[in-house]
């Protein structure tokens, strides 16, 4: 196990900057997830840590040692790629031991390591089979096992579940989380799927356009996003945004007004808010309430109703919304597309964003954060 530290790390291809001034502290034994939309630089950053890409500027440390000029094979990292890259003509044992054999490791040590990894990954009974005889989930476990036998200080996983179907993704999420708990090693995991990030990570790094947008525990990012990008990216369905007028401002609360005239106080830091300006109010679909229970009410026309059994997702078109508003109702709601519908907004669950995207600090204390 070892810590990973990045100081002002930049990566460019010619004049195109991919990773921009990245500062990160990853503790020894921590499970960290890099998440963000396609093209945000998360895989590039992972490859820089692995040594597969040169760092243009800045410093990378593992423990106390600067690693910028250290060869990938000597960094003590193991990488699991999106593609399994298994040798089709070799059985599982030979696939998992291939790197050790190239390194001319002792035969007894090779068998010991492969058997141990196979036991952890529940592959012991499959070691004589070839990859074509395995399911997608089993192949991914073999790819992880091939990295595991090298006994790296840091595991790097680059979207390892993206080739699996939905059911297998859930299963493998659990398997990887169990593996981390059992090994206690440092893991850095890349995904574009914020559900994977929320369910697996101890710490999430949200990347946007090459910059680190926010770093924190999953619930911290969910309840207290520092900007509108993080607020909209973390959570599924994503946060609703509504344009509001600032009516009054106090130190620990701000009074906002909708276009329909409804106004109410939101418990946020008002130190940088100006009376009379327009801002963006955010509210998560699952935090909306029946109209009679809200501090304010918004009316809209139902566009689509998605009945999932355990919940109903109601898509509304409203005058004030930056997009369609989504309301998640527990259980089944007996409503139809085309109907007029009202939803309640609880003040304590609201977020408030400046025009540059920065969030006002929420003052309501959420459970678990």
UniProtKB/Swiss-Prot annotation:
CDD domains: ABC_MalK_N. ATP binds at residues 36-43. InterPro entries: AAA+_ATPase, ABC_transporter-like_ATP-bd, ABC_transporter-like_CS, ABC_transpr_MalK-like, ABC_transpr_MalK/UgpC-like, Mo/tungstate-bd_C_term_dom, NA-bd_OB-fold, P-loop_NTPase. It is found in: Cell inner membrane. Keywords: ATP-binding, Cell inner membrane, Cell membrane, Membrane, Nucleotide-binding, Sugar transport, Translocase, Transport. It catalyses: D-maltose(out) + ATP + H2O = D-maltose(in) + ADP + phosphate + H(+). It is an enzyme of class 7 (translocase). Residues 4-234 form the ABC transporter domain. Its EC number is 7.5.2.1. GO terms for molecular function: ABC-type maltose transporter activity; ATP binding; ATP hydrolysis activity. GO terms for cellular component: ATP-binding cassette (ABC) transporter complex, substrate-binding subunit-containing; maltose transport complex. It holds the Pfam family ABC_tran. It is a peripheral membrane protein. The keyword Cell membrane applies. NCBIfam families: PRK11000.1, PRK11650.1. Part of the ABC transporter complex MalEFGK involved in maltose/maltodextrin import. Responsible for energy coupling to the transport system. Belongs to the ABC transporter superfamily. Maltooligosaccharide importer (TC 3.A.1.1.1) family. The complex is composed of two ATP-binding proteins (MalK), two transmembrane proteins (MalG and MalK) and a solute-binding protein (MalE). This is Maltose/maltodextrin import ATP-binding protein MalK. It comes from Aliivibrio fischeri (strain ATCC 700601 / ES114). The gene is malK.
């Amino acid at each position: 196990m070892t810590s990973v530290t990045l100081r002002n790390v930049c990566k460019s291809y010619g004049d195109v900057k991919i990773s921009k001034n990245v500062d990160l502290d990853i503790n020894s034994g921590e499970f960290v997830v890099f998440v963000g939309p396609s093209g945000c630089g998360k895989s590039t950053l992972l490859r820089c840590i692995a040594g597969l890409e040169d760092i243009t500027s800045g410093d990378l440390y593992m423990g106390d040692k600067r690693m910028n000029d250290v060869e990938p094979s000597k960094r003590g990292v193991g990488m699991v790629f999106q593609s399994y890259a298994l040798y089709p003509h070799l059985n599982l044992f030979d696939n998992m031991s291939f790197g050790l054999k190239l390194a001319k490791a002792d035969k007894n040590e090779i068998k010991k390591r492969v058997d141990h990894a196979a036991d952890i990954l529940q592959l012991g009974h499959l070691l004589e089979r070839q990859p074509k005889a395995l399911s997608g989930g089993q192949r991914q476990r073999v790819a992880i096992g091939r990295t595991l036998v090298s006994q790296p200080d840091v595991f790097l996983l680059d979207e390892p579940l993206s080739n699996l179907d939905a059911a297998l993704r859930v299963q493998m999420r659990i398997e990887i989380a169990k593996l981390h708990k059992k090994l206690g090693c440092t893991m850095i995991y890349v995904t574009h799927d914020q559900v994977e990030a929320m369910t697996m990570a101890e710490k999430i790094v949200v990347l946007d356009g090459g910059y680190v947008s926010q770093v924190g525990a999953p619930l911290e990012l969910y309840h207290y996003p520092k900007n509108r990008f993080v607020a909209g990216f973390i959570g599924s369905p994503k946060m609703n945004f509504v344009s509001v007028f600032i009516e009054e401002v106090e130190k620990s609360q701000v009074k906002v007004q909708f276009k329909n005239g409804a106004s109410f106080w939101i418990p946020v830091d008002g130190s940088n808010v100006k009376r009379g300006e327009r801002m963006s109010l955010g509210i998560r679909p699952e935090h909306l309430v029946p109209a009679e229970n809200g501090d304010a009410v918004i009316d809209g026309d139902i566009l689509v109703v998605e009945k999932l059994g355990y919940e109903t997702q109601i898509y509304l078109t409203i005058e004030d919304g930056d997009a369609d508003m989504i309301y998640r109702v527990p259980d089944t709601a007996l409503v139809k597309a085309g109907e007029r519908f009202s939803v309640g907004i609880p003040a304590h669950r609201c977020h408030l964003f400046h025009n540059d995207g920065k969030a006002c600090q929420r003052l309501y204390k959420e459970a678990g954060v």
